[in-house]
Amino acid sequence: MNDYLDVTELSGDDVSSEQVLRCSHRYFWAGHYCKDKDVVEVACGTGPGLGFLLRQAKSLEAGDISEPILNIARKYYGNRLPLKKFDACKMPFTDNSKDVIIIFEAIYYLPDIDKFIDECTRVLRPDGEILIATANKDLPEFNPSPYSHNYYGIIELKEIFQSRNYDTQFYG
């Protein structure tokens, strides 16, 4: 199995100011939806926004499929929040237990988006929300990850989620 270390931003990596701004904006945006809610971040990677979300949410759990990446997050966060290894399509949470599920820059790694949506539907409480940030495949400078399964455009995501009775909103 791929550990995604070669495509994950790690502490000490060179990153552009644009990358930092995009990451910050995603989590500040998510913070509004997570305020005093039970939240899980799926595919959390090294956890760049978990500290902020921890201060916003009533409860926060996070996980990733890559144990080496989770170990990096565990070194930083220690016992401040539960970090678990899990597959986004088989989450270790009880039915109707979360208000918000976050998946940032990882939906394209999922081999089956329908299984992911089924799992979100199981885990989310009624009126729960899924927050997604993803690459825009329609931009000229788009650079796909070598491990991706499928990049979705806005129209595709809208159709997929609305066919499953989710209301959708998109921000550019």
Report each predicted region and the residues it spans.
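Acceptor-substrate binding/catalytic loop of class I
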Residues: 141-160
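Short N-terminal helix/helix-N-cap motif within the alpha/beta-hydrolase-1
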Residues: 111-115, 142
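Conserved S-adenosyl-L-methionine
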Residues: 166-172
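Conserved N-terminal segment of class I S-adenosyl-L-methionine
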Residues: 1-90, 117
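A short beta-strand submotif of the Rossmann-like class I SAM-dependent methyltransferase core
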Residues: 100-106
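Conserved beta-strand signature within the Rossmann-like core of class I S-adenosyl-L-methionine
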Residues: 128-134
